[in-house]
Curated annotation (Swiss-Prot):
GO terms for molecular function: ATP binding; glutamate-tRNA ligase activity; tRNA binding. It comes from Helicobacter acinonychis (strain Sheeba). A motif ('KMSKS' region) lies at residues 232-236. It is an enzyme of class 6 (ligase). This is Glutamate--tRNA ligase 1. Catalyzes the attachment of glutamate to tRNA(Glu) in a two-step reaction: glutamate is first activated by ATP to form Glu-AMP and then transferred to the acceptor end of tRNA(Glu). PANTHER family: GLUTAMATE--TRNA LIGASE, GLUTAMATE--TRNA LIGASE, MITOCHONDRIAL-RELATED. The gene is gltX1. The keyword Hydrolase does not apply. GO terms for cellular component: cytosol. It is found in: Cytoplasm.
Amino acid sequence: MLRFAPSPTGDMHIGNLRAAIFNYIVAKQQHKPFLIRIEDTDKERNIEGKDQEILEILKLMGMNWDKLVYQSHNIDYHREMAEKLLKENKAFYCYASVGFLEQEKEKAKNEKRPFRYLDEWAALEKNQHNTPVVRLKAPNHAVSFNDAIKKEVKFEPYELDSFVLLRKDKSPTYNFACACDDLLYEISLIIRGEDHVSNTPKQILIQQALGSNNPIIYAHLPIILDEASGKKMSKRDEASSVKWLLNQGFLPVAIVNYLITIGNKVPKEVFSLDEALEWFSLENLSNSPAHFNLKYLKHLNHQHLKRLDDEKLLELSQIKDRNLLGLLRLFIEECDTLLELKEKISLFLEPKDIVKTYENEDFKERCSILFNALKSMDFQAYKDFESFKKEAMRLSQLKGKDFFKPLRILLIGDSHGVELPLIFPYIQSHYQEILRLKA
C-alpha cells in the first residue's frame, strides 16, 4: 500500500501535491491500494476544514483513494505500541523538564556544539509531581537506507539520540505516530519531500524496535525552488499554494501536468494524469532541486484550455449559451488561464466601461458619437464586418484610430485582442446585449 499523509494545518503546498501525485501514480502502476492519512494529532496547529479542503483538491486533480483514515483515531494503538517498547526495555521514561533541556540546549549553543540528549538525564528530576515522557533508546549503530532518488543515506550514532515517542500528555510525536501507522497499514513505499530525510532514521528505528521485518522503500523528492529568486518555495509564496493557483484560473489537469514535469524526464510536453500512468518512473526523477516557473505553467495551462471539449469549456467558463462556443475558442487563443478567459467574456457581455478606458474628453466624445451611431444600426442586416464598418464610419463621421479604438471598447470592452472581423458574427447575434454603457 502507498499513502499520502497531509496535515490539516494550512493550505496545500505544491510540494505536497507533487508527492501525492507520485504516490497515486505508483500505487496505480503497481496495482496497490492508495491510502490518505490525515495527520491530525497536533490539535493546536490543526485548522478546521482544512482536511476537507485537502480532500477536495485531490478529487479535483483526479485522484481517488481506496482508504481514508485520521491519525488521531489510532492514538490508543500508538500508546499500546509505546507500552510494548517500555516492557521490552527498548524505551524508557524521562522526567527531565522542558526548562532543564532548554538550559542544556543553550549551553550547547554557547559551546558551539550540537545538542544531544543524554540518557543519564532521564531520572534527574524524577518525583511524584513530574509527569514523564517516553523516549526510544538511542542506537549504538549507524542507520542507513537506500533512497530511490538520493541513493544511500547514512546517519551515524552521534547524529541520533534517545528521542521522544509519547509526550507528557501521552500524545504521540509525529515520528512515532507516523512509524506506527506505516506498519499498521503495511505501507511498502513512501514518496515524500526531502525535508523528511532527517525523520526517516527515527521512523526506521521505531519500526525495527517494534519487530518489523519488512523495510519500507523511501523516495525523497528534492525541494522546489522559485526560478526567479532561486530560493525555496515557501508558504509565503502565493504560487506555492494549490488553492491560489486554482483561484487564479489554472486547470487541475495543467497543475498535475506541470508538477509531474518539473525535475523529471517526460516523453511529451502536454499530458493528463491518466497518460502519465503509462510511462512515469521514479528512476527519471532528478536528484537536483526542481524549479518553479509560473510562465511555463501558464503555457501548459493554455495548451490544456485548448484541449477542453465543448461541454467542459461551457461549464468552466460558466456560459450557458452554446452559440458563444466559437467566441470562447477565439478568446482562448489569447488567454493563459480560465480567469483571463472569464474576464474576456465578461468584458464582451457586460455594459462597457468608458470611464475605465478614459483617455481624454475627446476620446469620451468620440465614444459617445459612435455609440449613438451604433444604436441606430441593425447589426444583423450586414453580410460582413466590412459593410458594417463602412456604415458605422459614415454615420459617425469617424475614421482611423479615432474610429477603431472606440469601436473595440464599445463592442468587446477591450482595445486589444481578437480581430474584429473574426468576432463580428458573435457581435451580430448579441449586439443588443453587448451594446450597453456602464452607468
